[in-house]
């Protein structure tokens, strides 16, 4: 860093520290002015039923004996308790949800995780596991008086096994680091959530994360071959192995994937890798109607073409992304499809030509082929930046992920637009059109209580319609807090009964991530 830049940074530090220390008071003042019936996140006195919250709870320190034992086992530097240190862990990527934890602890080994869990279980102290905090359903949000178990320092890639096409990692390794390590040895790790630069593998496993390439390559579950998990009582369990085929007993590995930290804490992940595709081709097609884009997607799938990426942006999102990323997206259209095919060079050329032909048949205004790898990457980056681009338009951005069968996609897109008009809401919609996963993104201000109430009604209508069309309330973001009130309607009584029974057996004291998924 240049000396003058360092001096400027040093000069700013006192002001920055003062702001962090003052932040709770400023936030409390804002909330006192804007508190509403929506302020219900994990508040026993307020009841259930609202999606979002604006209340910032006061810090409630854990019992001194618990903190003392944590410091003894982990070291004082690995236990955070001051208010300014806890603020960054009081929220995740979910808009408007806030709660101060009792403390934050950093762990580096499985043994330390087991020690913390034994303590939490013995004292019946709630514990919430956290990676990078990029989740979009409130899955890693604290509850009052809880221990936040942060795994970001468990960040080692332990083994890359080229003979068996596997990689063994700790939960704090970022998704991008896994992908880069695979690429370095000529292999490929396909799952690519939008936050892959900072999201951790542990979080990906907890949420069963998807990504842009999910249509062809699947989601996180398809690439987990084994897990080391610490159970709530501190017992360490290994499930899975490097075998391609293994049908011995229940698939406990699959039980923990997508369980959102409610059944155990993942401490190691054995990942499957695949050969890197030899070639790829990226294209952008623009349409003057969203229905035409949706029909193009249906025709591509009907032609038995499975692209690795088949994404869409609506008009609002296109303009926001271009203003944000400046990659030369066309602005004179209502819908944009980002299409990418990969594999053998001859197959790639054939599929790309067929997709371009189908796009034109469905009224595409233009089909643009990326000229080189750099242009292809910039187009993919533009799509990945959709959420960030939309977030600049309003103080509060709420991203959802209702998912429907591909055959119902056009109906669902029209329904979202109708809901936005009915409730007078601003919504930008983008998502994984190839697998029916929509991301309607609400642009609002959490202080506008009347609009937040309308958004809550809009969510209910969108999720009800997704279920009616044979879809789901979440394709990749998880249930967490944001959608737990919608889960019983989607899952039904029998599934809810089985899930509650499983959770009760593994975690009878209900210490792990309480208040998430279901009560």
Regions found by a protein language model. Name each.
Residues 19, 23, 41, 56-57:
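Aromatic (phenylalanine/tyrosine) cluster motif
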Residues 56-118, 122, 135-165, 194, ...:
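N-terminal flexible segment immediately upstream of the FAD-binding catalytic core
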Residues 81-87, 271-275, 281-458, 465, ...:
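C-terminal substrate-recognition/cap domain of FAD-linked oxidoreductases
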Residues 156-311:
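FAD-binding subdomain of flavoenzyme oxidoreductases
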Residues 235, 484-519:
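Activity-critical C-terminal alpha-helical subdomain
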